[in-house]
């Protein structure tokens, strides 16, 4: 489950719980919330490494979910210098011949990435193309479809000197 969906579920559950009427006359520990008002529920009982913290700054406020295991490791490494983590680009970067040094744009222009073979058209083919556009005939091939019961003279071939009977 992704963090935004968890965050949204807890935020809606918290807002529903805060909007519920508070009964001060009885000593009930639980708030009476109608089932229709509940948008979602997030159970964190079995997760011991998840902490929910209130968060607010000048632009945002809400609940912050953190992994306590990662937070404790990061707190221990606070004084460690990052000198050994720096790497020089020429050491690990390898470019193939002709590969650009820059990152490609998401919406690249056609001339930038399109490569045409000799004789290939610049346009997209139509779904119902005309016959002259895609039909290719070999020398001596007829333009028509052969009949199923073709006449003998049409398909019979005689060698020189061969009798007709």
Curated annotation (Swiss-Prot):
The keyword Signal applies. GO terms for molecular function: cupric ion binding; mating pheromone activity. GO terms for cellular component: extracellular region. Residues 20-89, 105-110, 126-131, 147-152 form a propeptide. Residues 1-19 form the signal peptide. Pfam families: MF_alpha, MF_alpha_N. Transmembrane segments: none annotated. This is Mating factor alpha-1. It comes from Saccharomyces cerevisiae (strain ATCC 204508 / S288c) (Baker's yeast).
